[in-house]
Amino acid sequence: MSLTVKCPTCQTPVTWNAEAEFKPFCSERCKLIDLGDWASEKNAIPVKPEFAPELLDQLGYDDADFFLDNNPFEDDKNR
């Protein structure tokens, strides 16, 4: 028994079985359109930031030497 789903791009009915080459898409064209949407960030998975962006400003993250001054892997002799 096969399942029928809608193509995520154009909503055309697609039979979901082993022979469906582009599942869940109806065609390579729809598959590539979807890929392009992800690549251009038109599609995105929403993520809540773990911290407030204002904290980066308070830490001096925007200063040019932030990473140079806070590198734990570099000792003062290598500068």
Curated annotation (Swiss-Prot):
Q: Which residues form a coiled coil?
A: none
This protein's record includes keyword Acetylation: no
Where on the tree of life does the source sit, at the highest rank?
A: Bacteria
Keyword annotations of the record:
Metal-binding, Zinc
Q: Which InterPro entries match?
A: DNA_gyrase_inhibitor_YacG, Znf_NHR/GATA
GO MF: DNA topoisomerase type II (double strand cut, ATP-hydrolyzing) inhibitor activity; zinc ion binding
Asked if the Swiss-Prot or TrEMBL record annotates the protein with the keyword Hydrolase, the reply is no
Q: Cofactor binding mode, per the note?
A: Binds 1 zinc ion.
The cofactors required by this protein are: Zn(2+)
Biological processes annotated in GO = regulation of DNA-templated transcription
| Residues holding Zn(2+) | C7, C10, C26, C30
PANTHER family, per this entry?
DNA GYRASE INHIBITOR YACG
Stated role = Inhibits all the catalytic activities of DNA gyrase by preventing its interaction with DNA. Acts by binding directly to the C-terminal domain of GyrB, which probably disrupts DNA binding by the gyrase.
User: Which family does the entry's similarity section mention?
Assistant: Belongs to the DNA gyrase inhibitor YacG family.
Describe its assembly. Answer: Interacts with GyrB.
Q: What is this protein called?
A: DNA gyrase inhibitor YacG
